[in-house]
């Protein structure tokens, strides 16, 4: 005997709504309608309930311990990278205690006002407004930009896009050719002239 017309999976005779109503985990049974609502049923519902933390104290404690484990794992990876880098560069191996103490020293020294002032002073460039310094700065910038873009040739007006050697060789070639042509014209018998 096949399934009844009321359902395709069968078991309709055994199904009781009362059992579902009394079940503590009825959301698991009606998962599609309650936990993954769609359309107008999704209005006002938190559709990302699954990505949020749990509310029981044991679940919160386990999440916190997982976060601590993750932090420790990342710290171990960084220390391992430091050791491998020191080994590759031929430096002495840093100990774990030295790594943690150097991190603490770095944190305390970067927060001091004196260090921040000295860093700011060392990074700031002196911009004197005297004409000599201004001229020197402009010359330096000009040579830097000329060197960068190959525009140092622009300052010599006799140069073309051709190299000096090529330009001279072609100029000499053309002038010699023109001279030969002129000489031939002068000595040719078909002048029709004298």
UniProtKB/Swiss-Prot annotation:
Residues 133-169 have a biased composition (Basic residues). GO terms for cellular component: nucleus. Residues 52-71, 86-194 are annotated as: Disordered. Residues 53-63, 98-111, 119-132 have a biased composition (Polar residues). InterPro entries: MMTA2_N, MMTAG2-like. PANTHER family: MULTIPLE MYELOMA TUMOR-ASSOCIATED PROTEIN 2, MULTIPLE MYELOMA TUMOR-ASSOCIATED PROTEIN 2 FAMILY MEMBER. This is Uncharacterized protein C6G10.10c. It comes from Schizosaccharomyces pombe (strain 972 / ATCC 24843) (Fission yeast).
């Amino acid at each position: 005997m096949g399934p009844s017309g009321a359902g395709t999976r069968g078991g309709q005779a055994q199904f009781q709504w009362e059992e579902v109503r009394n079940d503590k985990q009825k959301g698991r049974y009606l998962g599609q309608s309650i936990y993954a609502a769609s359309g107008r049923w999704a209005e006002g519902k938190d559709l990302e309930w699954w990505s949020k933390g749990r509310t029981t104290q044991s679940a919160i404690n386990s999440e916190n311990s997982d976060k601590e484990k993750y932090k420790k794992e990342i710290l171990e990876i960084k220390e391992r990278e430091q050791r491998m880098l020191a080994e590759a560069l031929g430096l002495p191996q840093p100990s774990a205690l030295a790594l943690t103490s150097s991190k603490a020293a770095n944190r305390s020294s970067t927060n001091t006002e004196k260090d921040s002032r000295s860093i700011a002073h060392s990074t700031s460039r002196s911009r004197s407004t005297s004409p000599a310094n201004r001229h020197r700065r402009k010359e330096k910038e000009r040579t830097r930009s000329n060197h960068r873009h190959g525009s140092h040739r622009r300052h010599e007006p006799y140069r073309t896009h051709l190299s000096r050697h090529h330009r001279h060789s072609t100029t000499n070639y053309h002038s010699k050719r023109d001279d030969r042509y002129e000489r031939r014209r002068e000595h040719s018998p078909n002048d029709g002239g004298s």
